[in-house]
Amino acid sequence: MAAAYKLTYFNITALGEPVRFILSYGNIDFEDNRITYDDNWPSVKPTLPLPYGQMPIFEHDGKIAHQSLAICRFAAKQAKLVGSNDWENLEIDAAADTINDLRMKIGQYHYEKDPEVKEQKKGPLFEETLPFYIEKFEKQIEKNNGYFAVGKLTWADLYFASLLEYLNFMLGKDLTDGAPGLRGINEKVRAIPQIKAYLDKRPQTPC
């Protein structure tokens, strides 16, 4: 019997990994359709049902969804990683969106093609942006009993832990160095049996 859900993304962690973590946590069967990014990609891309030309995409019962955070929110509901009321979900969504804000700022530095411009971006990122976010995150985690929101494990925690390898790859350093709250979340998430089982079987990729 075919899996009820199909996730299509590149064969890396990045924006596909949060969905994989959340579905794995919920023991939700899904097809992990990994696309190799190589010289064949330009010919492969037109064959994929990409609503806006980007991945990941998520398929279910003949329907197709895009946008990684929207997919995460849907998957989190299925996996019961959401809050108990609308306000709690607002706090969880805000935490995940803020993590994504940081991801985009790191990406703007990492993917800069002009070496001189990239060097100009390095100082502000490492000396201002990262310390600002890490300090805020640490206070937030302390306030929420070791989690990002509502004092318990939610999809925001899985979102961070699943992105960490990719963030570290782009930075060339461990984002959790000197940040015990962030490190603790990563360790707790990776110790979850369902997540550990997924990590043990997933393909080895550069990031």
Predicted segment positions?
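Generic preference for well-ordered alpha-helical elements
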Residues: 16, 89, 134, 179-182, ...
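Hydrophobic alpha-helical bundle segments that form small-molecule/ligand-binding pockets
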Residues: 138-149
